[in-house]
Regions:
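Solenoid scaffold repeats with emphasis on beta-solenoid/beta-helix
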Residues: 39, 63, 74, 222, ...
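Residues on the solvent-exposed faces and adjacent turns
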Residues: 9, 43, 54, 67-69, ...
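Short glycine/acidic-rich loop motifs that flank beta-strands on beta-rich extracellular proteins
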Residues: 49-51, 214-216, 238-245, 249-250, ...
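Extracellular polysaccharide-degrading/modifying enzymes targeting complex plant/algal/animal polysaccharides
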Residues: 2-256, 276, 283-312, 473-480, ...
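Catalytic-core region of carbohydrate-active enzymes that cleave or remodel glycosidic bonds
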Residues: 407-411, 420-454, 464-497, 504-553
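Hydrophobic, small-residue-rich alpha-helical packing segments that form membrane-like cores
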Residues: 271-273, 277-333, 338-367, 371-373
């Protein structure tokens, strides 16, 4: 028998939970709900950490948590309100409050330093600690000062350094940098003292909140499956630094479960990650940072095999849907995951303003950061104003990144130590840096690319690949570089020079022209006795065709406007599949601007006639062949073929030809096209 439970702030947890007698907390309903039940949460603020006791049994017997129709979103907060502030007589605008540690329970974020594998700033043992806690004035978070003196006279900053690229980046809100806090925890006295500079505001008259809870909606146990969370606002949970070798906390997440749907929510101001589809703790808990016995790479490799031993399999872990969420103002990620992010669908989310406070940094920071996202589809998301839009790391296999819009990021996309096959198609990449590539085996088809491309090899890390559509490990390999397909893309450089990389495909010009040339290079390396008995890993072939190079973009031969890459397809047809498709050079520029309007995001551009007239063959799985190492077809998660006849806007074609780039409807001259909108 299916039940419908109701929750209202004015309710009573001793009640029965029906419409007339609602519970007061979501947590009470989460203890009662059984498979097939629905928990309807009415508008109001809920300061609690929801730990669902049970999951559903199947896709048809879920437990659903949803906001009440026709009401404002219910809000779950990881913070508590704080009053009783006292202003310092000798330091105007600086106020202090002493909190009893009992308000935090067994987790005090102001006593817990940021720590873990791949954390670079603050550097453990070198830099002063920073902490998981935060202070909020009317919903806006402050910055932590590592000294009390820094609270007395904070200096505004108009630029911060991007840690990865070492370039200056403008601060979005300069005045906000003067709002700072410092805390000291006295375990003997059982108190936490916070000092904060409110810049003239009276904290006893305003809404001031401090971090208390690590999560908002997160089961404490694994395998709490088939839960839907819809229509909430969640904010101000701390989470924790979330590398792939630790428990990956999120403001909301399934905690190593299967079949969750997280949809139609507003998720913001997580100190670290808003949504975690990540790893549990038994397969790794920051052992590199704790012991230094082995490297982080080795512990991460071990984590894959440990996870297999505890049930990392298709149908048991992952398989989540994250869609139609607005996610912003988070310190590390909007969405993070390792292995639990396999077999998922990440669709139509608005991901923005991620990691722009730059209070900390490590090699896990991006709007979306996944490891081992096997067969995961990331589609139709709007990703902007992030230090890095998307970072796919380790085992990007069977993954598809399609119909997304990237803009106003420091970097749009990074893919690391993966061997394919993965597909990046029908996206708009409008930031100055489109792609940092530390990987191989990708196919890039029908994208509009405005930024620079920078490829790398990775000879010192051998990472896993899998049998198709499973988590079973088939082998490990290093990244030799190349073995990629670049077909039907439109390279449209903008006036802003990329801080890294080159426009077009010229950065790949050292790749061999064919599989035959690759083998000749490898044989020459084996003939050199000075290299010993180790592996030989020369650059692999690159396959390109059907691309348009506008003014400023260079083809593989590094000559601007010289774009005939077809021989790479013709000579290698037996290995690569497909047929010849000649690229096109156009010596005219194509200015591209993205504009936010009330009804969505618009792309404005002036298209040269030569570009509008081009027609390229629709790309299919048969045209893409297989990556050299993995030997898996480029195909959909269910094993069916790709037929890339649908553009960014979802417009399917009936012909076998289409325009290069992501928009088949471009016309000569001025274009003003809505490329992303909310469903409602």
């Amino acid at each position: 028998m299916k039940f419908e439970y109701h929750v209202k702030p004015t309710g009573n947890d001793a009640a029965c939970g029906d419409t007339e007698h609602p519970f007061a907390t979501i947590s009470k309903a989460a203890q009662m709900a059984s498979p097939g039940d629905t928990v309807i949460v009415h508008e109001g603020v809920y300061r609690e950490q929801v730990d669902p006791r049970r999951g559903g049994l199947s896709e048809h017997e879920r437990i659903t948590y949803c906001g009440a129709e026709g009401e404002a979103r219910p809000v779950i907060k990881g913070s508590e309100c704080v009053q009783g502030w006292t202003e310092l007589a000798d330091h105007p605008h600086v106020w202090t409050v002493v909190l009893d540690n009992t308000m935090f329970g067994d987790f005090n974020p102001f006593a817990t330093p940021i720590f873990g594998d791949w954390l670079e700033m603050p550097k453990f043992g070198e830099d002063p600690d920073k902490h998981l806690g935060d202070v909020y004035l009317n919903g806006v978070s402050f910055f932590e000062s590592t000294t009390l003196e820094g609270v007395y006279d904070p200096q505004p900053r108009d630029t911060d350094e991007d840690f990865a690229l070492k370039i200056p980046c403008p601060v979005p809100d300069v005045d906000r940098t003067r709002y700072v806090w410092h805390a000291e925890v006295d375990e003997n006295a059982g108190t936490t003292t916070i000092w904060a500079n409110f810049q003239g505001a009276d904290p006893n008259e305003e809404l001031v909140e401090v971090s208390v809870r690590r999560t908002c909606f997160f089961p404490s146990r694994n395998h709490v499956n088939y839960i839907t969370v819809r229509g909430f606002e969640m904010a101000q949970a701390t989470g924790d630094w979330a590398p792939p070798t630790s428990q990956q906390w999120g403001m909301i997440g399934p905690n190593w479960s299967y079949g969750w749907i997280i949809e139609d929510n507003v998720l913001h101001d997580a100190k670290f990650s808003a949504v975690s589809l990540g790893k549990e703790i038994s397969s790794g808990d920051n052992e590199w940072a704790k012991t230094e016995r082995k490297t982080g790479y080795q512990y991460q490799l071990e984590a894959v095999f440990k996870a297999r031993r505890i049930g990392w399999e298709k149908g048991l872990i992952g398989g989540h849907i994250v869609r139609n969420n607005d996610i912003y103002e988070c310190g590390q990620n909007a969405i993070v995951g390792h292995m639990g992010s396999a077999f998922c669908r990440i669709e139509h989310n608005h991901v923005h303003h991620i990691a722009l406070k730059r209070e900390f940094f490590g090699w896990e920071v991006a709007g979306i950061k996944f490891h081992a996202a096997l067969d995961t589809v990331i589609a139709n998301n709007n990703i902007h104003d992030c230090s890095l839009g998307m970072w796919m790391d380790w085992q990007t296999q069977g993954t598809r990144i399609t119909r997304n819009v990237f803009h106003d990021n420091v970097r749009d996309l990074m893919i690391e130590v993966s061997h394919g096959p993965y597909l990046v198609d029908n996206n708009v990449f409008a930031s100055p840096v489109m792609f940092q590539n530390w990987s191989q085996g990708g196919a890039f088809v029908n994208n509009l690319i405005c930024g620079g491309i920078e490829p790398h090899t990775v000879p010192d890390r051998s990472t896993p690949y899998h049998y198709p559509h499973t988590t079973e490990v088939a082998g490990c390999a290093v990244v030799s570089g190349g073995d990629e397909r670049w077909l039907n893309n439109m390279f449209a450089p903008q006036p802003v020079k990329p801080t890294v990389g080159e426009y077009g495909l010229s950065a790949y010009s050292d790749c061999p022209m064919s599989m035959h040339e690759y083998l000749e290079r490898q044989r020459a390396m084996w003939a050199d006795p000075s290299q010993g008995g180790g592996e030989r890993n020369p650059l692999q072939s690159l396959y390109a065709g059907g691309n348009i190079y506008l003014s400023g973009a260079q083809g593989l031969n590094k000559q601007e406007g010289a774009a005939d890459d077809s021989e790479r397809m013709q000579e290698d047809a037996s290995f690569f599949g497909g047929t010849a498709s000649t690229s096109v050079a156009c010596d005219e520029p194509m200015p591209v601007t993205l504009v936010e309007e009330p009804d969505g995001l618009y792309l404005q551009c002036i298209v040269p006639q030569a570009v509008a007239d081009t027609r390229m063959q629709v790309v299919t799985s048969d045209m893409l062949g297989v990556p050299r190492i993995v030997e898996e077809r480029y195909e959909q998660p269910d094993g069916s073929d790709y037929v890339l006849d649908t553009d960014l806007l979802g417009q399917a074609l009936t012909a076998t030809e289409r325009k290069a780039g992501a928009l088949n409807g471009l016309v000569s001259g001025e274009n003003h096209i809505r490329i992303w909108e909310w469903n409602n």
